[in-house]
Amino acid sequence: MSDIPELTDEQLARVIPSSVRKRLILGQFDSGEDIAALRCFVGLTQAQFALAMGISVHTLRNWEQGRRHPEGPAIALLRIAARHPRIIRENIASIESAA
């Protein structure tokens, strides 16, 4: 069973301002802080978010700390996470329950 708390979309939307969320939906990740904000918006730990995205925690940390930048398909997945956080949360919950 997943230890992710159930939050409404409205509660999730309060985590980051709508102006920042709009930039993220457009794939405008100006800094590692934007990716960290998105992860917090989705409501997952680094390990959970990395698993849901199909990347290593090391890669996610590099993005969040600004050492590397997501490209191509990773940006598309980040946009999906910004638009549909519940889908990402459901994905990780199903992965964790299957383990």
For each feature predicted by the language model, list its residue ranges.
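Short basic helix-loop element that most often maps to the first helix and adjoining turn
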Residues: 34-48
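DNA major-groove recognition helix of helix-turn-helix/homeodomain DNA-binding modules
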Residues: 73-90
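N-terminal positioning helix adjacent to the helix-turn-helix/winged-helix DNA-binding module
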Residues: 31-34, 73
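Recognition helix of helix-turn-helix/homeodomain-like DNA-binding domains
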Residues: 55-70
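Conserved hydrophobic/aromatic packing and binding residues within compact polymer-binding modules
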Residues: 35, 49-50, 60-63
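N-terminal flexible/basic segments that precede or flank functional cores
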Residues: 1-29, 87-99
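Short amphipathic alpha-helix starts
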Residues: 49, 53-58, 78
